[in-house]
Amino acid sequence: MRCVVYSIAKSSPLELVKIYQKQCKRFDCELELVDLFPKNTANAQKVSKELAQKSYSLAFEPYLNLKAKNIALHPKAQRGDSFAFSKMLENHLNINFFIAGAYGFEENFLKDCQAWSLSEMTFSHEVAKIVLCEQIYRALSIIFKHPYHK
């Protein structure tokens, strides 16, 4: 299995994420994080919400894979517990997660993904990545009946 988390963010070292990446390998899952922040995104965010959202879509589009499960994290989307999250991931070999910038996703981009919400609360990119990586590991623990999830 391969899970890739794409986000509109400047890169930052996250030690906890590295721990979850290592733990996911136990389940033969490569957990990869890719931070994207093209120059046009920085400029677009200064101009308008619509332009910013378009720049996020343009940054993410090369990574949308029709053969993979594409999941966009969106605050107004479906949410559920860790068991529901694990069911969503089960039986997929390639999963791409997308975390938009401050202005969120364009509606057109969301049409190409399944939308999922981690919470009603707003998180920084760093916190969202940590929560997502932990939930991916927890989902794998549920799927493979590992005692991490009790």
Curated annotation (Swiss-Prot):
InterPro entries: Alpha/beta_knot_MTases (IPR029028), RlmH-like (IPR003742), tRNA_m1G_MTases_N (IPR029026)
Entry's EC annotation: 2.1.1.177
Keyword rRNA processing: yes
Keywords noted in UniProt: Cytoplasm, Methyltransferase, rRNA processing, S-adenosyl-L-methionine, Transferase
Entry's Gene Ontology molecular function annotations: rRNA (pseudouridine-N3-)-methyltransferase activity
Catalytic activity: pseudouridine(1915) in 23S rRNA + S-adenosyl-L-methionine = N(3)-methylpseudouridine(1915) in 23S rRNA + S-adenosyl-L-homocysteine + H(+)
The keyword Transferase is assigned to this record: yes
Pfam family name, one: SPOUT_MTase
Compartments where found: Cytoplasm
GO cellular component: cytoplasm
Positions of S-adenosyl-L-methionine binding: A100, L118, S119, E120, M121, T122, F123
Subunit annotation: Homodimer.
Family matches, as NCBIfam families: PRK00103.2-1
Function, as annotated: Specifically methylates the pseudouridine at position 1915 (m3Psi1915) in 23S rRNA.
Family from the record: Belongs to the RNA methyltransferase RlmH family.
HAMAP family cross-referenced by the UniProt entry: 23SrRNA_methyltr_H
Record's protein name: Ribosomal RNA large subunit methyltransferase H
